Amino acid sequence: FDVPVSGTHAHSWIMSFPDEYTAFKAYADIYPNACLLLVDTYDTLKSGVPNAIRVFQEMKEAGIPLTKYGIRLDSGDLAYLSKKARKMLDEAGFPDAIISASNDLDEFLIDSLKVQGAAITSWGVGTHLITSKDCPSFGGVYKLAAVMGKDGNFIPKIKLSENTEKVTNPGNKKIYRIYEKESGKIKADLICLADEVFDENEPMLLFDPLEPWKKTKLPAGSYTLRELMVPVFLNGECVYDSPSVMKIRDYSKKELETLWPETRRLVNPHKVYVDLSAKLYDIKISLLDQMSAE
């Protein structure tokens, strides 16, 4: 996937040597340009950090450039230990030494550590990143939205439910993302019928699909539109060129910048609205009225 790989050594590396210092020295000899030492195998502040400092001093005296070096904390009170370790490293003359932290970190722990003033410069996130721990499954079911009539036109269909959020949106549809023109931030996503065309120089009316009394009117010229859906398969043939992992990452980072700060906050975030066009809303209400009359 052309993704750069980096990391440190394991506790087993330390334990395979007679003592911690010898293990650190051997690792530094092998990786002098990427010397990140795991300091919590025995005692972080009494032996781990002092032994790491000893190795760094020896590298410095030997004329080895200290380009990328530091320590990793993998247990204990990371806020407290990082502050103590930072003080020890600074006093020893290594103010640019990296302090990396790991140990089942997620976005909430990282945010908490930052609030506590933890002296951590690098975050190692593994388990929570690769396992989708907070949401391990994606709930999705097939629902019919439209059938093609004999004349070639789609006939919209709707499914009702005791749960409002499970009532489907009828018809053959497409999706636009609406951006506020002034800020470039996302205003809402718009679900509309596949044949609808919009003019950014005309006002637009949006309907909340769950709370239809909530309407948003966008003034003409105040927004821009981008269609989100692209063809992947046409007539059984794949017509989509999958981008590289790095391009996907770049796209994701770019799109994240279009979210409002209130949407990106970890606690009680504001939501991105997904609305219906006036035409789709009218069809949905019409079908609901028909179903309730039967």
Language-model-detected regions and their locations in the chain:
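Buried, small/hydrophobic-residue-enriched core segments of structured protein domains
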Residues: 1-92, 105-115, 129, 150, ...
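Short hydrophobic "strand-cap" motifs at the C-terminus of beta-strands
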Residues: 102
